[in-house]
Amino acid sequence: SSAASDVYKRQVVINDNNPAFNDADFTTISFESYGELDELGRCTTAFANIGKDIMPTEKRGAIGEVKPTGWQTAKYDSVDGKYLYNRCHLIGYQLTGENANEKNLITGPRYMNVDGMLPFENMVADYIKETDNHVMYRVTPVFEGENLVASGVLMEAESVEDHGEGVKFNVYVYNCLLYTSDAADDTPC
């Protein structure tokens, strides 16, 4: 569909869109797991099997008290939402209800959060709401050297009950600061 192809314009598909889950990972029991922060205080992998039973039923609370590595406040009138940087949930709030969990928040520009990650999160949430099935979901921030801000995130998902027929992706979403919203090609950012 054109909506699905629009999602991929600023991302790179990894391994022909096949996630790297092990067969043993698949279950119909919902869970969520957040890796320990590394020695520099950076997030590591967030992993979940998302079902309706762990999706939130209330609006997200404040997350301003969490200062992920590399955090800075930068406000510009020309940026949609005014703030250049967002606290980006590795696993979006709408999926597991994790709010101000420092193991689930990284610094990223609004573009990566809203245009990069959110369409994939919405795809998963919509599928679960429509089918009541589960989706294996893993997001891994990728840091270069000792950088405190991730260069991007690896997002993997696969629907469980229908073996990936409903949702299946493995994409790297760039942490982009500068971009042109009218780019006609598939050049990242």
Give residue spans per PLM region.
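Domain-level detector of nuclease and nuclease-like folds
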Residues: 21-181
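Short, small-residue-biased leader/transition segments that mark boundaries at the very start
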Residues: 3-8, 182-186
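N-terminal low-hydrophobic presequence detector
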Residues: 1-5, 84-85
